[in-house]
Amino acid sequence: MASLNDSHFDLFDLPAQFALDASALDHAYRTVQAQVHPDRFAAAGDAQKRIAMQWATRTNEAYQTLRDPLKRATYLLHLRGIDVGAHENTAMEPAFLMQQMEWREGIEDAAAAKNVDALDALLTELRDEERMRFDKLGALLDSGANQAAGEAVRQLMFIERVASEIGTQIERLDN
């Protein structure tokens, strides 16, 4: 069995890359989880139970990270020695900053007008932008452009926050 210190990719015997076969990840997760599930160690001693729990927790964390594209990209960059620094490094290219302001204004205007259709349209626009940026992120990671990939991750984190904010506004208006 792998070591608790192995990478998430090594744990599931998957290549350390952004593009990931979701069904292969799911299969690998189920295989590892079946081996380490604490129920298999119910009759074991306390030390073995504790180790099984550590493995189960580690397996779940690895799976949750790899199945989410943004977390997977952040993790890949971490493995490459790049700290995305989303909280400290908020500098973004001017065009993206302008786009951010437009999205925020659109949210404010639609929420003030109680216009759920406008919020839905904005959410669709954001999801389209997100898909395009994930494609770009994959290419950046594949080419080893790690600094640019870090910038792309920060932008995608922002897009996710804005999309969540739109969802909250839609929910508020629907109630």
Curated annotation (Swiss-Prot):
Ranges for domain J: 7-79
GO biological process terms held by the UniProt record: [2Fe-2S] cluster assembly; protein complex oligomerization; protein folding
Keyword annotations from UniProtKB, A to Z: Chaperone
Highest taxon in the source lineage: Bacteria
Keyword Chaperone applies: yes
Gene Ontology CC terms, in alphabetical order: iron-sulfur cluster transfer complex
Bilayer-spanning residue ranges: none
GO-annotated molecular function: ATPase activator activity; protein-folding chaperone binding
A Pfam cross-reference name: HSCB_C
Record's subunit section: Interacts with HscA and stimulates its ATPase activity.
Family affiliation: Belongs to the HscB family.
HAMAP family, sorted: HscB (MF_00682)
Function: Co-chaperone involved in the maturation of iron-sulfur cluster-containing proteins. Seems to help targeting proteins to be folded toward HscA.
The protein's name in its UniProt record: Co-chaperone protein HscB homolog
Classification lineage: Bacteria, Pseudomonadati, Pseudomonadota, Betaproteobacteria, Burkholderiales
Gene designation: hscB
